[in-house]
Amino acid sequence: MASAEIIAVGTELLLGQIVNSNAAFISQELAADGIYVYHHTVVGDNPERLKEVIKIAENRSDILIFTGGLGPTEDDITKQILADHLNKRLVEDEFHMNKITEYFTSRSRKMTENNKLQAVIIEDSVVLNNDYGFAAGMYLKANKHTYILLPGPPSEMKPMFTSYANPLLVSENGEKIILESKIMRFFGIGESQLAADLNDLILNQVNPTLATYAGDNEVVVRITATASTKEKAAALVKDMEEEILRRDGTFLYGYGEVSLPEHVTAMLLERKMTIAAAESFTAGLFQAEIARFPGISSIFKGGMVTYSEEVKQSMLQVPAEVIEEHGVVSSECAKVMAENVRRLCDTDIGISFTGVAGPDSLEGHPAGTIWIGLSVKGNESEAFQYVYGRDRNHNRRRAVKQGFQLIKHFLETNK
């Protein structure tokens, strides 16, 4: 099976001025073709270093895909360096030269000589038309390798790759190998624990492959299988998925690119269950998160941010004796907050967040101590305690996610 390497050319990438989104796009497209990308390389606009990168890539990859360095300026060196490396001439492509000339003529503007460089290609290349710019792309086979040269701007690179380069790659790589992937998302279990639970599967993986990633207060598992047909690849993925679920299915919250808040919001919308929130240390973060999703106005009636004790009493009607006897960082306060916001907003669900964001302690509780209250109409109110670390904003984000998880658990166990 052919292997590919993506070489992004541009000093601006090394300086972090531009994010290399091209590599992610090309990798996803090639994965669907059954072509493995084993290396992403970024090199600046330096001839000697680019020559070195080309030699290294040829020793480990069948297909070399270049992005960037095809423009009209002196630092656009990709095709010149590759042409020298392959002992090939640079020649003019008539189509792109006419396109550039017509552009300047139609606007009564003088065309500088350097603009012609965009229409120059390496001899023996298949020209890849640039439908959204001037720099010609190239598809070239030499020395038992395939070289693809694409422009740097994503608005030009993506359509060129999709319309011209990728079809050539697929047609020349024989029978298409089908790649099937599935993303599983877990919350409430750390990456190290999940990896330990799946250790034998990870160590013995062949096909499908299995990988775990730490996300934002969650763990992502990716299963990838290859086969001659989509059905066979999907079956391999399914077998692995079922084994993972058998071991840690209680922590699974969803699949693909759907986040935990989005998944829970969809459940609430489907059941037409209304919700309100009372927030202290999260300061409206839960409400801001749930408000991101379309259609939320039909179920999210509103909420309150009651940071101080005085506002908890005056707006949320938390009895002074609850605060005096138990403190604001307590099960009792969390439950009253959830109950009262549900009552005041007349909703099915009320959720509350109170705790110590950090880094300092409060009421004798260390940073990261939080309580989440949950009040559901017709059910006894509950409060759940968690103890995180000292990172203030991490604690706030994690608490909000935990709140969504608690709602999810209730909905799943009370269908």
UniProtKB/Swiss-Prot annotation:
Short name of any one Pfam family annotated for the protein: MoCF_biosynth
InterPro entries reported for this sequence: CinA (IPR050101), CinA-like_C (IPR036653), CinA_C (IPR008136), CinA_KH (IPR041424), Competence-induced_CinA (IPR008135), MoaB/Mog-like_dom_sf (IPR036425), MoaB/Mog_dom (IPR001453)
Transmembrane residue ranges: none
Gene3D superfamilies (UniProt xref): 3.30.70.2860, CinA-like, MoaB/Mog-like domain
Matches recorded under HAMAP family: CinA_B
Family, similarity comment: Belongs to the CinA family.
Protein name per UniProt: Putative competence-damage inducible protein
Organism: Listeria welshimeri serovar 6b (strain ATCC 35897 / DSM 20650 / CCUG 15529 / CIP 8149 / NCTC 11857 / SLCC 5334 / V8)
Gene designation per UniProt: cinA
